Design a protein with these regions (language model features):
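N-terminal active-site segment of His-dependent metallophosphoesterases
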Residues: 24-90, 190
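Solvent-exposed loop/turn segments at secondary-structure junctions
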Residues: 40-43, 81-84, 109-113, 148-151, ...
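Extended active-site neighborhood of metal-dependent phosphoesterases/phosphodiesterases
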Residues: 87-205, 231-241, 256-292, 302
Length: 303
């Protein structure tokens, strides 16, 4: 299994009301660390193009063995534990059970690529009562948004919500949106209001926030973006204490910055036969560092 540590990407974080800086504060002690995995997308099927589905089990084992050597507050998977088929979950979750740190999961589009009869069972299988969630770790609040909430794949075909999402998708296609793709999705107005409340509560508690989702929000030319990415970016833009938005979905990875928020798209584990991308994020008072493994980039030009 091939992975190696990559050099650090240092992301400067502004203090509330203070302009951002990429300068690392040498005196800062780490406040917490967490692991990041994106798109294992396992299924017992032959490789297709650059996607090596079966190899993801061995990659997960190697990744988890490495993560277990670090003192992590938690590890988060940014969606798509499986590629398809409900039976694919068990082998994947057996590997995750070896994690020493708590495991947080973001639901992804492929996690619902199961038979209609199994779709209502997916969230329970992932141990999720809700796709969107919030948890605090000291001075940090981690918020997960659920971009599968409005989508043509989340619910059985007979569910009215599937027809509503399909209608929205066709409207977006008619309007020429590059992210009007059936494998994307959207968050509801109710979830947007919840996000606003969570970010306001974080500010009142003097916490910085990191938001995690499956779908990218930026850059605008990425066809993998959430259908209503602009609405989420607008909410984030009102809250300068949001340090970063972390996501998967686009297996190539990506990076953007808007205002004081860093938008980091982590590479998909399912890509390539042996290269194994994952990362460890370390949170300091005024910056983040991302330690990439395997092909996960260092993005050193931002330092």
């Amino acid at each position: 299994m091939s992975f190696s540590r990559r050099r650090f990407l240092t992301l400067g974080l502004p203090a509330l009301g203070i302009s951002p800086t990429f300068a690392q504060s040498a005196g800062n002690a780490p406040q917490l660390r967490f692991g990041v995995i994106a798109d294992p997308q396992y299924v017992d099927a032959p490789e297709k193009g650059t996607r090596h589905y079966r190899a993801s089990l061995a990659k997960l084992e190697a990744c988890i063995a490495e993560l277990n050597q670090h003192d992590l507050a938690f590890t988060i998977t940014l969606g798509d534990l499986i590629d398809r088929d409900f039976k694919s979950f068990d082998p994947v979750l057996e590997r995750y059970a070896k994690l020493k740190s708590p495991h947080r999961i973001v639901p992804g589009n492929h996690d619902f690529a199961v038979a209609d009869a199994d779709k209502p069972r997916v969230m329970e299988k992932l141990g999720l009562q809700s796709g969107h969630q919030s948890l605090s770790h000291g001075n940090w609040r981690f918020i997960v948004i659920d971009g599968t909430e409005i989508s043509p794949y989340r619910y059985p075909e007979s569910d009215p919500r599937t027809a509503e999402a399909t209608k929205l998708l066709e409207s977006l296609k008619t309007q020429g949106h590059n992210n009007a793709q059936s494998w994307n999705g959207a968050v509801s107005d109710t979830q947007l209001q919840w996000l606003e409340k969570e970010l306001t509560a974080a500010k009142q508690a003097n916490q910085r926030a990191i938001i995690c989702g499956h779908f990218p929000l930026l850059p605008e030319n990425d066809s993998h973006r959430l259908w209503n990415a602009e609405a989420v970016v607008k909410v984030i833009g009102r809250h300068p204490h949001v340090a970063a938005y972390l996501n998967g979905h686009n297996h190539k990875g990506n990076y953007a910055q808007a205002g004081t928020c860093h938008y980091v798209n982590f590479k998909g584990m399912v890509e390539t036969a042996s290269d194994n991308p994952f990362a460890i994020v370390t949170c300091y008072e005024d910056h983040l560092t991302i330690e990439g493994f395997g092909p996960e980039p260092s993005r050193q030009k931002l330092s």
